[in-house]
Design a protein with these regions (language model features):
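Transmembrane-helix exit segments and adjacent C-terminal regions of multi-pass membrane proteins
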Residues: 1-31, 253, 272, 389, ...
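Extracellular/periplasmic helix-loop-helix junction of adjacent transmembrane segments
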Residues: 40-68, 107-110, 302, 307-312
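Helix-loop-helix hairpins in multi-pass membrane proteins, especially solute transporters
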Residues: 75-208, 225, 230, 234
Length: 535
């Protein structure tokens, strides 16, 4: 089997303190990157002359590439060396960040930030886990795992605030320039990294890898193409689901023939592992839906600056960080299944409270979101603290690395799926509401209704009311007021529809939580601390 624990004993780094800091910095950049993009949506749209749907497609695509290639990337590290995979991952991220600094159009963002940067992310996470395991021993190893995990948690908590401040006070491009500086500093410490030799079987299941890429890619790209009004939606979705079925068949076939599969299908014989993977996916779908819908609402509807949006999102991110930290320290006092069930319940309650507030919130009452978002964030924090260990607990030590890779891929796919589906439903709802409200209007002339609906369907998604008023400057006052009214009514409705994605994900997770509680607890068969990075 390809993904095995390395039997070679770890060797202590020559400068463990500095190497630990550099690895933590790499993880910080990995997590903060998407937060920066989310809170900068309106600025990126304006600066590049593109659309909100285009930028959110790039965000979803970056998560998709990371998910689709993370399994094969871990095998590449086994084959060519974990240090090389780590270096290529850093370089991929650097290329993506540099492209964002210099980008003049959306195509550059998609090619270099989403695709190249996504490939970099898929290489970084599995190689970092192996390198930490191979460069540190004993207490030092546990300390570095804690440092890197803390860096990820802190980045998730303060990323929206950092990104919002830089974007509002200076420019969003500076945030990505700072990422380049951090990555350069991390690359300067490559001499401290000792490569970790892999002594297992050096073969890669290329057919299985292709099926996994087509399965994830077909589903998410189908949703993104639907969002953009493309005609290949059915074909892409069919490719995705057929590839998923072929992947399952192929893995079982290779296992029975004694050949090396991309993933050992017997991993899924464990019911806790299957339910845990599902929970991981639901958690990330919920997070992805919130990540894309709320920043767009805050910036494009309430017209908050990036900093204002970051501050409004702070209750979500800070409560997630605080509760995850607290729950992690108190682990063992409650059954993990009970905590997971409570986590999904809190996410569902938080989203349920947000949905009716959306049409009632004005720019000066955005703080109404604070309590619901804090509740949802607390739920996500509970899930972050428990799901990873629950999922991996039934897996034997020699297969834990492979299982952690599957867990990471499921989470990344869930994030990309949530981003894509929530964004697509929001735009579909916008199109429907624009058309319906324009046709029902008693103010707009009959000959203009179809034209207004078409214009709003194409342009209103990227325009604030202020920008729309400027564009309508030559129209009669009553026409201006009516179009602004349509804009005001359609957008909150669209956000409410988008929020059904995280709500449904939380409810499915809650259902799974009840199933978990009815099952007996599983005592971990391996030390899971080092695999906390994969959650």
């Amino acid at each position: 089997m390809v993904a095995q624990a390395d039997p070679a004993a770890p060797a202590e780094s020559e400068n463990p303190g500095r190497l630990g800091l550099l690895l933590s910095a790499a993880m910080f950049v990995l997590v903060v990157d998407t937060s920066l993009m989310n809170v900068s949506i309106s600025a990126v749209v304006e600066d590049l002359g593109t659309t909100v749907s285009g930028v959110q497609s790039a965000i979803a695509l970056e998560a998709l590439v990371s998910a689709a290639f993370i399994l094969i990337s871990s095998k590449i590290g086994d084959l060519f060396g974990r240090k090389l995979a780590y270096t290529l991952g850093l370089l991929g991220y650097a290329v993506g960040a540099i492209a964002m600094v210099l980008a003049q159009d959306l195509r550059t963002v998609i090619i270099f930030w989403a695709i190249v940067g996504g490939l970099g992310a898929s290489l970084l996470l599995p190689s970092m886990q192996s390198l930490i395991h191979g460069n540190f021993t004993g207490i030092a190893q546990r300390r570095v795992y804690a440092m890197v995990g803390a860096a990820a948690a802190i980045a998730a908590a303060i990323g929206p605030l950092i990104g919002g401040f830089i974007t509002t006070v200076l420019t969003w491009r500076l945030g990505f320039a700072l990422e380049v500086v951090v990555i350069a500093a991390v690359l300067s410490g490559l001499g401290l990294v000792k490569d970790v030799k892999f002594t297992g079987e050096r073969r890669i299941d290329l057919v299985g890898a292709a099926f996994s890429v087509f399965a994830m890619g077909g589903v998410v790209l189908g949703i993104l193409v639907w969002q953009e009004g493309g005609e290949a939606v059915a074909a892409l979705l069919a490719i995705g689901f057929i590839s998923l079925g072929l992947l399952a068949w192929w893995l079982v076939r290779r296992k029975r023939r004694g050949e090396v599969p991309l993933i050992d299908p017997t991993l899924f014989s464990s019911k806790p592992f299957r339910i845990g993977i599902s929970g991981q996916m639901m958690q990330q779908i919920a997070l992805g839906g919130l990540m894309i819908a709320l920043p767009i609402f805050l910036q494009m509807v309430l017209e908050y600056t990036a900093l204002g949006a970051g501050l409004m999102l702070a209750p979500l991110s800070l409560s997630m960080f605080a509760i995850a930290t607290l729950a992690g320290r108190r682990a063992g006092r409650r059954r993990p299944a009970v905590i997971i069930r409570l986590g999904f319940a809190l996410v569902a309650i938080g989203v349920l409270l947000v949905i009716p507030l959306v049409p009632r919130i004005e720019p000066d009452t955005g703080w109404w979101l604070a309590i619901p978002l804090a509740i949802a964030g607390a739920g996500l924090g509970l899930l972050v603290s428990q799901l990873n260990n629950y999922t991996l607990a039934p897996i034997e030590a020699e297969r834990i690395s492979e299982a952690a890779g599957v867990n990471s891929a499921a989470g990344s796919f869930g994030l990309s799926f949530g981003l894509a589906l929530a964004g697509s439903l929001m735009l579909a709802s916008l199109a429907f509401n624009f058309t319906t409200l324009a046709n029902d209007s008693a103010v707009l002339p009959p000959d203009d209704k179809e034209q207004v609906a078409t214009v709003l369907n194409e342009d209103a998604e990227v325009m604030s009311n202020t920008a729309l008023e400027a564009q309508l400057a030559g129209e009669p006052p009553e026409i201006q007021a009516e179009i602004i009214r349509i804009n005001d009514e359609a957008r909150p409705r669209a956000l409410q529809v988008a929020l059904l994605v995280p709500l449904l994900a939380a409810l499915i997770g809650l259902f799974n939580g009840f199933r978990m509680v009815r099952m007996p607890d599983v005592k971990p068969k391996a030390d899971l601390e080092e695999f906390a990075l994969g959650g």
